[in-house]
Design a protein with these regions (language model features):
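Glycine-rich phosphate/diphosphate-binding loop of Rossmann-like nucleotide-binding domains
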Residues: 4-23, 116-180
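Structural/interface elements that position substrates and couple domains in central-metabolism enzymes
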Residues: 16, 22-51, 63
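Active-site rim loops that border cofactor/substrate pockets in soluble metabolic enzymes
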Residues: 45, 158-203, 207
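N-terminal glycine-rich phosphate/adenylate-binding segment common to multiple enzyme folds
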Residues: 45-116, 203, 207
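Short, acidic/small-residue loops that bind anionic groups at enzyme active sites
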Residues: 82-104, 172-179, 221-236
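Glycine-rich phosphate/pyrophosphate-binding loop and the adjoining helix
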Residues: 116-142, 146-147, 275-315
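Glycine-rich phosphate/nucleotide-binding loop
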Residues: 189-280
Length: 315
């Protein structure tokens, strides 16, 4: 039986990225109830938002296993009491809670400018070209339009969309349009058709978790995740070794276990342990090590059990 995992990602006070309305919370929780696998919330600790979240969570399902990761230590401190309050009242089941400090490592793709592309971004750009080429090829076969979701304000996103325009060229039956994260939320709530293609850059956690909460079928494959109408080209653009913060690796670690994808799990887990280890030295948050070990042990269980059963059958 799959574990139910509620992923809460706490951001600094970036109001434009906060899920502000009650309808958004309810829509995501409704999808979580349907799939029983995954959900996504961003936490705003303002009094109004707290009241709405407490009310909604109290009336929501019992959560068998919630894994909470923080991308920002200041936000983590602010939100800790709120999360404890909510989960203490919502569920009596055991849940894992902890804090992953942002890694000092930084992916340079997040600072790409149109007029200043460093040599270190060449690899990323080549991956973008591959992903775009693959997406356009698929669009030609199925004769559908492309919707590209990127970070609208980042240089990397502009490069991605420019590459799409170039690749499409004279293909008159294919068009590309651009949406940002706020519009993606509306797609997940059913207000707009879901994108045909989603390209992510450095914000894996915000993008992938929102998408996973919206998928009708479990993703499959290694370099692409397939759904009935959506392809998420993640691996091509964002190799695991270039993940920019521990929260992103944490997300990959969690849903890799849910999807029982050993390859993803090992890549994300290895990176997370290495990255967070650097953060320990800088922030002296050594208590995180025990928590991280507990999380890895916990989410590894279904994979280990499955292997043991497989070996037994061979004997």
């Amino acid at each position: 039986m799959n574990k139910r995992i509620l992923f809460l990602y706490s951001l600094p006070k970036q109001k434009s990225q906060i899920l502000r309305c009650e309808a958004a919370f309810k829509a995501i929780l409704r999808k979580f109830r349907q799939t029983g696998i995954f959900s996504y919330l961003q936490i705003d600790t303002s009094p109004t938002c707290r009241e709405k979240m407490v009310e909604i969570l109290k009336s929501s399902i019992k959560i068998s296993n919630a894994v909470i990761f923080y991308g920002d230590i200041q936000s983590a401190n602010q939100d800790a009491l709120f999360i404890k309050e909510v989960f203490g009242e919502v569920t009596q089941e055991r849940f894992l809670a902890g804090r992953c400090i942002c890694s000092p490592l930084c992916d340079e793709i997040s600072s790409i400018k149109d007029d200043a592309i460093s040599e270190s971004t060449v690899y990323h750009l080549s991956q973008i070209k591959k992903a775009v080429s693959l997406a356009v090829s698929e669009a030609k076969k199925k004769k559908h339009n492309l919707t590209v979701c990127t970070q609208s304000e980042s240089g990397a996103s502009r490069l991605i969309f420019r590459e799409f325009e170039y690749a499409l060229g004279k293909e008159r039956h294919i068009s590309a349009s651009h949406i940002d994260f706020d519009e993606m939320l509306l797609c997940s709530m059913g207000h707009y058709p879901f994108p045909d293609v989603v390209l992510t850059t450095q914000a894996i956690s915000r993008t992938a978790s929102l998408l996973l909460a919206s998928l009708q079928k479990m993703p499959t494959g290694y370099s692409c995740w397939h759904t009935e109408s959506t392809k998420i080209y993640l691996r091509e653009i964002f190799p695991f070794e270039q993940i920019s913060c521990a929260a992103d690796a944490s997300l990959l670690l969690v849903f890799s276990a849910v999807l029982k994808n050993e390859l993803f799990l090992k890549s994300a887990g290895d990176w997370l342990k290495r990255s967070v280890s650097l953060a320990y030295e800088k922030c002296e948050q050594t208590h995180c090590a025990a928590f991280l070990d507990e999380v890895i042990c916990e989410i590894n269980k279904p994979i280990r059990n499955r292997k043991e059963k497989h070996n037994d059958s061979e004997d």
